[in-house]
């Protein structure tokens, strides 16, 4: 494999300082070298264990330290999770992501998590999980169960990180990513824009991600969703152009990674989302609520796809078929139908 040069902070800062139109042009050129610009990967995310998290992430309504009105729930039954996965597949998703509000999974829960992964894979969906810190053995067990992706975000730069989280170190996050990679699972890791960070911090986050031994296959870029009761509830809104700029820099720095629009898409108008796709975003969460924050309704997503001429990307998975792909493509190319949206809203 050819040596991949490491990025420097000054190089990344220069990208952020480029005139926006020049930056978008460069990002779109890079994007077209590695991806079909009309294809977007579609995922659904389910919270399989909600609330009562012992961590103190200042942005998160799931932390037990903040009064956000979120009711804590135990780990969902395996069949409940698989039923949600079936609905996600019927609605057109090709990847099903399962998130649990834990510092780390308990050993007693591992057999259930393995069954969830196996069940999702048996449907022909890609399986992704985000469960907090993992041990080497836990990462290997999930890999053996067939897990495709593991999400563990770095959130922000190492320098700003201590202002947001104190219950888990930055190095712990990097260690988990290494364990996931060593187990043979693809890495999903990104961060959040709007925490109160500077442009230098955004550059520092992307620098960490791009300079990993192997960059993440998937890079979610979140816009802070301000939740009443969390310490960041009164943060300033993120300027749309600043967010688009972050997407473009991520695309240039990690040309073969999927750059995903994740939390915060509900706050974006169609024009902002469209410019994010121009900047190189090529993955979204579709439909179901994004953990505990709103996600645009399916029909709005489909309408936007039609307006922009975008298509959901087909995903080759074991034991799968393309039924969900055909459903979604049909919905994208034809007017809304009761049959499709009843299926999507089940």
Curated annotation (Swiss-Prot):
Keywords: 2Fe-2S, 4Fe-4S, Biotin biosynthesis, Iron, Iron-sulfur, Metal-binding, S-adenosyl-L-methionine, Transferase. Binds 1 [4Fe-4S] cluster. The cluster is coordinated with 3 cysteines and an exchangeable S-adenosyl-L-methionine. Binds 1 [2Fe-2S] cluster. The cluster is coordinated with 3 cysteines and 1 arginine. Belongs to the radical SAM superfamily. Biotin synthase family. One of its GO terms (biological process) is biotin biosynthetic process. It comes from the Bacteria. It catalyses: (4R,5S)-dethiobiotin + (sulfur carrier)-SH + 2 reduced [2Fe-2S]-[ferredoxin] + 2 S-adenosyl-L-methionine = (sulfur carrier)-H + biotin + 2 5'-deoxyadenosine + 2 L-methionine + 2 oxidized [2Fe-2S]-[ferredoxin]. Catalyzes the conversion of dethiobiotin (DTB) to biotin by the insertion of a sulfur atom into dethiobiotin via a radical-based mechanism. PROSITE patterns: RADICAL_SAM. GO terms for molecular function: 2 iron, 2 sulfur cluster binding; 4 iron, 4 sulfur cluster binding; biotin synthase activity; iron ion binding. This is Biotin synthase. SUPFAM superfamilies: Radical SAM enzymes.
């Amino acid at each position: 494999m050819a040596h991949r040069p490491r990025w420097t902070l000054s190089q990344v800062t220069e990208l952020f300082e480029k005139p926006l139109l020049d930056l978008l042009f460069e990002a779109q050129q890079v994007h077209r070298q590695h991806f079909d610009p009309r294809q977007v990967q579609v995922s659904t995310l389910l919270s399989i264990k909600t609330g009562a998290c012992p961590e103190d992430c200042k942005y998160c309504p799931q932390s037990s330290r903040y009064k956000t009105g979120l009711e804590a729930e135990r780990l969902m039954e395996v069949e409940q999770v698989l039923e949600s996965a079936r609905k996600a597949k019927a609605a057109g998703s090709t990847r099903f992501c399962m998130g649990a509000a834990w510092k780390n999974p308990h050993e007693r829960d591992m057999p259930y998590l393995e069954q969830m992964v196996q069940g999702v894979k048996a449907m022909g969906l890609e399986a992704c999980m985000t469960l907090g810190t993992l041990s080497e053995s836990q990462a290997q067990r999930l890999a053996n169960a067939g897990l495709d992706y593991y999400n563990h975000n770095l959130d922000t730069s190492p320098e700003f990180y201590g202002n947001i989280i104190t219950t888990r170190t930055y190095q712990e996050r990097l260690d988990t990513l290494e364990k996931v990679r060593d187990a043979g699972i693809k890495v999903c890791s990104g961060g959040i824009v709007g925490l109160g960070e500077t442009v230098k911090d955004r550059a520092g986050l992307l620098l960490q991600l791009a300079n990993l031994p192997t960059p993440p296959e998937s890079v979610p870029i979140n816009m802070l969703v301000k939740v009443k009761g969390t310490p960041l509830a009164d943060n300033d809104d993120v300027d749309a152009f600043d967010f688009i700029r972050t997407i473009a820099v991520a695309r240039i720095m990690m040309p073969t990674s999927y750059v995903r629009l994740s939390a915060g898409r509900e706050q974006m108008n169609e024009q902002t989302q469209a410019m994010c796709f121009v900047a190189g975003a090529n993955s979204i969460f579709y439909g179901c609520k994004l953990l505990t924050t709103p996600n645009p309704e399916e029909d709005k997503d489909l309408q936007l796809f039609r307006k922009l001429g975008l298509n959901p990307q087909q995903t080759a998975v074991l034991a799968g078929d393309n039924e969900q792909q055909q459903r979604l493509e049909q919905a994208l190319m034809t007017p809304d139908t009761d049959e499709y949206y009843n299926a999507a809203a089940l």
